[in-house]
């Protein structure tokens, strides 16, 4: 199981950021994020907003549930 949290840097983080960016165009309460592969405050804030919008536990951490929802939203 992948878990993404602040201060992680890798290609998989860029994937999460791409999903978040796509969601931010559909839902105005989710802020736009840069796609740099770094899980910083900007990404954490967007993850938290995404979790809040979809009534997930608001941790700012991309756990399995959050990742699954991000992925499904990217297919919409």
Which residue ranges define each predicted feature?
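Conserved hydrophobic/aromatic packing and binding residues within compact polymer-binding modules
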Residues: 47
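Active-site catalytic microenvironments for nucleophilic, acid-base chemistry
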Residues: 19-23, 53, 73
């Amino acid at each position: 199981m992948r878990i993404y949290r602040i201060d992680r840097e890798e290609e998989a983080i860029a994937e999460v950021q791409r999903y978040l960016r796509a969601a931010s165009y559909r839902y105005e309460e989710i802020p736009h994020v840069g796609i740099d592969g770094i899980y910083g405050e900007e990404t954490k804030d967007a993850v938290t907003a995404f979790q809040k919008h979809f009534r997930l536990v608001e941790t700012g951490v991309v756990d399995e549930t959050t990742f699954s929802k991000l992925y499904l939203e990217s297919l919409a």
